[in-house]
Amino acid sequence: MTQKTRKILKAALTAGVALAMSGSTFAQATAATPCFRGINLSGAEFGKPGGKINKDYTWPSEETVAYFASKGFDTVRLPFMWERLQPKLMQPLDKDEVGRLKEAVERIRAHRMRIILDPHNYARYNGHLVGSELVPDAAFGDFWARLAKLYANEHDVIFGLMNEPAKIPIAQWLNAANQATAAIRGKAGADNLILVPGTAWTGAHSWMQPIYGEPNGVAMARFEDPGKNFAFEVHQYLDDDFSGTKNNCSRSDDAVDALKSFTLWLREHGFRGFLGEFGAPGGKVRCIDALKGMVDVTEDNKDVWTGWTYWVAGDWWPATEELNIQPTAEGDRPQLAALKPALSDFSAEGKNCPSLN
């Protein structure tokens, strides 16, 4: 989502899927691999740089992880703050925060869920754009080389380069993304899947619009991955400005059409896609129907879509947040009805994601 606001391979899902186990990490499946059907568990990106754990920010609790695993989610997108993980550019990662990250990853792994690492920084470090004099591309590459080494070639961990690059020229962002990817493949020696956003908050609706220079759909076609293991990440909301900050679904049809258009772009260029954020208010039938329509686009086109992660849930999200699907004392949130058909699809076809195999 914009700065204005703020699966898990569960046992039943893995039946018939051969997994080679190594310690607490499960390796790539030797049989079919399901698409990502996940949830954003938000909290570690809260507050300002620094801050005190469990006062200013938090990592997902066991209770929250277990709940979403029990519902059939098989992936967690895990937002965190770059500045906390690396307080000084070009310097080692903070040992304490790395420890908290590792604990969160193991908590999620214990439920056989996959993890998407998400530096939730909008292409900034301490307010300065990546690719600027104060945050050069080399610093972004250094950060990713250090982070990728922690989970190099552990294929249940996916590297999301950056959350929603915003107000940054597309040429500047493309250079930074290419350098970070080169560092992941080179310095870290990691072959993990990389998720690559565009600029302009990586909206599917604006993928072909020239907002910060060339359209994402033109410039990002020049993205370079020496490992050739990446997918383009887009976000899409349903409200009047597609920000996900309004309590309406007035652009539902346009949002679904945007995903369909992005699907055509993926197929035309031979690329893969990932829907990293999408969500809807739970109190309106139209919104729930539109939410299902968005999921259906990805589920019906698994040759190019690697999956999705819903926004949002997390231990500290208020019950009044319209998009929040953290359970309340009354039980499950209404939005789960739109996600359930995909989460409960245990058929052979449902467990097979051609774009990941």
Feature map (PLM): residue ranges:
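Bacterial N-terminal signal peptides that target proteins for export
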Residues: T2-L13
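Boundary of Sec targeting at the N-terminus
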Residues: Q28-T30
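Active-site mouth of glycoside hydrolases
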Residues: A32-P210, P215-G217
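Hydrophobic beta-strand scaffold residues
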Residues: I115-L117, G273, W308
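Histidine-bearing beta->alpha loop at or near hydrolase active sites
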Residues: N163-E164, W308, G314-W316
